[in-house]
Amino acid sequence: MVELTAFQYTLLQAANELVEPSGQDIRRHVDAGPFHASPMNHGRLYPNLETIVEAGLVEKGEKNDRTNLYTITDDGKDALETRAAYLSN
């Protein structure tokens, strides 16, 4: 399993909480959350989303020519459960 940053786990959690979100849906969800101090920019969002896609934790699909959708995989859900168990100890 790839080691994720706290920010990447935040993106993974957002993908889990939303239904077929676009990258911008994920950005808005994270920006609205209590743990994000400043608005996220494109240069931070998409490379980190790509990392969790490449790790097999999220699948990237197309909504249209300009918009991708991100769907959490079973491995992504397992990673969130493992992280939650680790943080609760």
Regions flagged by a language model, labelled:
Residues V2-M40:
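N-terminal helix-turn-helix DNA-binding core of bacterial DNA-binding proteins
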Residues H29, K63-R66:
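Short linear capping/connector segments at secondary-structure termini
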Residues G43:
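Key DNA-contact positions within bacterial/archaeal DNA-binding proteins
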Residues Y46-E50:
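Short, hydrophobic-biased segments on the C-terminal half of alpha helices
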Residues V53-N64, T71:
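Beta-hairpin "wing" of winged helix-turn-helix
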Residues E81-N89:
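Amphipathic alpha-helical dimerization/coiled-coil segments
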